[in-house]
């Protein structure tokens, strides 16, 4: 495996997805087919089908452990079908969410246990972690205001509509993860202007994947 794997993480409303889109616009002309942009849950037809089940607002009866297991199943398929082949082909993979999301959202947000969810995902991924995780940090109240102000109501999912306490737990878990793994997880203050956030994220990507930009 010779490629480089970088994940993007953050609470809802942190702006990581729009930052990834802006970065893609800048580097795709340089990297061409060497660049793979993907997301979780999703990234291939099977995982996208699982995504639809997980995020469907009609699925209010979904058990929290079921939710965590579905995320892990989607992740395993995504890894096997999309990420590992891309890394084997020496590509730069930028992924919108990965294991840290499950630890934060299901482990802490759903309160089913951060360690338990981490172990579940270690099995699903065979322990594969990104070289770098770009973490977009924003207080929960700011993220939720952004969602309410800017997100298409038709695109609001089951997790977006959770109460503020849920999102506070998610952010706290992310900060614990960053403190525990500072060499991998790089924190960006996502309350800054979008241009500054994108510039910082792009700098981190270029540092982690320097050989693609030489």
Swiss-Prot record:
Recorded GO terms, molecular function? Answer: ATP binding; dTMP kinase activity
Do the record's keywords include Iron-sulfur? no
Residues reported in the UniProt entry to bind ATP: 10-17
Q: Which HAMAP family match?
A: Thymidylate_kinase
Q: Please state which protein family the record places this protein in.
A: Belongs to the thymidylate kinase family.
What functional role does this protein have?
Phosphorylation of dTMP to form dTDP in both de novo and salvage pathways of dTTP synthesis.
Q: What's the protein called, per UniProt?
A: Thymidylate kinase
Q: What is the lineage of its organism?
A: Bacteria, Bacillati, Bacillota, Bacilli, Lactobacillales
Q: Which gene encodes it?
A: tmk
């Amino acid at each position: 495996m010779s490629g480089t794997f970088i994940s993007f993480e953050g609470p809802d409303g942190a702006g990581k997805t729009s930052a990834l889109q802006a970065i893609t616009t800048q580097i795709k002309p340089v990297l061409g087919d060497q660049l793979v942009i993907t997301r979780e849950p999703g990234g291939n037809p099977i995982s996208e089908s699982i995504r639809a089940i997980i995020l469907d607002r009609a699925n209010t009866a979904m058990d929290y452990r079921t939710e965590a297991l579905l995320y892990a199943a989607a992740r395993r398929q995504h890894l096997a079908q999309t990420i590992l082949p891309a890394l084997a082909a020496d590509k730069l993979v930028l992924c919108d969410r990965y294991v840290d999301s499950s630890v934060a959202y299901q482990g802490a947000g759903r309160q089913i246990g951060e360690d338990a969810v981490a172990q579940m995902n270690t099995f699903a991924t065979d322990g594969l972690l990104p070289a770098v995780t770009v973490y977009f940090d924003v207080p929960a109240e700011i993220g939720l205001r952004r969602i309410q102000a800017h997100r298409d109501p038709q695109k609001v999912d089951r997790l977006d509509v959770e109460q503020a306490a849920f999102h506070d737990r998610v952010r706290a878990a992310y900060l614990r993860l960053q403190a525990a793994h500072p060499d991998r997880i790089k924190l960006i203050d996502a309350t800054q202007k979008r241009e500054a956030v994108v510039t910082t994220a792009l700098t981190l990507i270029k540092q982690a994947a320097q050989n693609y930009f030489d």
